[in-house]
């Protein structure tokens, strides 16, 4: 297989992966999106969290909500809990690793 065929094969596998993901997760993603919209229409905020690379994805979503994404619009109320390493370290040291996000959500998620 030459380089060109390899690149085409990579694209085909990516398309197959996207189709599988759409079929497996499409309904859940739609429901989550509806919940986010409903929350914001009720004047609530979106709180995102994650560890490792999932924390980066959470932060990316929050950035898109706070800043216009594809169209100019007002900022939407959102915050990422995984960006504050000092708070995460303090909570983990005193309460345990499992409480890092739970403590913050209890305090900020109203």
Language-model region placement:
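Conserved N-terminal alpha-helical segment that immediately precedes and caps sugar-phosphate-binding
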Residues: 1-110
